[in-house]
Amino acid sequence: MNTVPFTSAPIEVTIGIDQYSFNVKENQPFHGIKDIPIGHVHVIHFQHADNSSMRYGYWFDCRMGNFYIQYDPKDGLYKMMEERDGAKFENIVHNFKERQMMVSYPKIDEDDTWYNLTEFVQMDKIRKIVRKDENQFSYVDSSMTTVQENELLKSSLQKAGSKMEAKNEDDPAHSLNYTVINFKSREAIRPGHEMEDFLDKSYYLNTVMLQGIFKNSSNYFGELQFAFLNAMFFGNYGSSLQWHAMIELICSSATVPKHMLDKLDEILYYQIKTLPEQYSDILLNERVWNICLYSSFQKNSLHNTEKIMENKYPELLGKDNEDDALIYGISDEERDDEDDEHNPTIVGGLYYQRP
């Protein structure tokens, strides 16, 4: 077990540790969270009482340092810091515990939900997606865009003749560097296999993604889980797009190892089970889920996911699913600029359009 002390709580805030949260009043004598399980990554997240739209937080692994939270009045944020003096850190923690000013990490539930939500998420992979190498923890907030979103916006601005720069373009530390998934790219569609690769993404999934970029299914699932959690905790739109794209890529492939399908079904079950119902309109794309569960190659492989979706979100399912198609974020101008119909187009993952 480990501890994250807080130096103070000068403003009212909702504090979350993993999937649990609680409110702290202004200047309440609160000094941290103790008994955090070691062995998983964790996330501490914040939402200020006077700023309902902004959510932010820090991913960390207790084994990688002595972390504490300090409020920065200049930026108006609770910031994670690292104390490199181990003895000093232990003395501070002991003092706060003695004064009973810390809350305990909630008792692990029967299903060990946090393990199931983060089974494949590793801190070293997080730090590659959230590129801020000087820290042993990673900051994420609701406003962060993905590198791929920035490229799409940059391309659109250039085509419109604008000199404006895409937000976060020059600040990779404030972007999420998820793996680019582009179904129209040269990597996805091989010369001589255009129709095959257009209809069935097995080559793109198995050869390009699993064998090439990710090296194995564990790394693939790690990014999928991380994207979901960033979408859920921070309402991060780009993360929601990445989560849907990675699910869609598997479901659009006829050839997928059975162990991978079984694990995907388990992962999605716990994700949908944990997702707060009030977020469904924002984070669940009706079109994508209908395709995956009822029209895709893998429509008979996700039994647990289908069951919990039908029980929890019946209003999202079963609407003309056989004829639904993905709506890609590709403009007419981008089509006109292609040398041929299979040249890659810069897209922000799979962009799904709500009806």
Swiss-Prot record:
The modification Phosphothreonine is found at residues 274, 345. The modification Phosphotyrosine is found at residue 328. Transmembrane segments: none annotated. Residues 261-282 are annotated as: Leucine-zipper. Residues 331-355 are annotated as: Disordered. Residues 331-341 have a biased composition (Acidic residues). The keyword Ubl conjugation does not apply. GO terms for cellular component: cytoplasm; U5 snRNP. It is found in: Cytoplasm; Nucleus. Pfam families: AAR2, AAR2_1st. CDD domains: Aar2_C, Aar2_N. InterPro entries: AAR2, AAR2_C, AAR2_C_sf, Aar2_N, AAR2_N_sf. The modification Phosphoserine is found at residues 253, 331. Its main location: cytoplasm. One of its GO terms (biological process) is spliceosomal snRNP assembly. Keywords: Cytoplasm, mRNA processing, mRNA splicing, Nucleus, Phosphoprotein. Phosphorylated on serine and tyrosine residues. Present with 7330 molecules/cell in log phase SD medium. Heterodimer. Interacts with PRP8 (via RNase H homology domain and MPN domain), competing with BRR2 for the same binding site. Component of a U5 snRNP complex that contains at least the U5 snRNA, PRP8, SNU114, AAR2, SMB1, SMD1, SMD2, SMD3, SME1, SMX2 and SMX3, but is not a component of the U4/U6-U5 tri-snRNP complex. Component of the U5 snRNP complex that is required for spliceosome assembly and for pre-mRNA splicing. Involved in splicing pre-mRNA of the A1 cistron and other genes that are important for cell growth. Belongs to the AAR2 family. This is A1 cistron-splicing factor AAR2. It comes from Saccharomyces cerevisiae (strain ATCC 204508 / S288c) (Baker's yeast). The gene is AAR2.
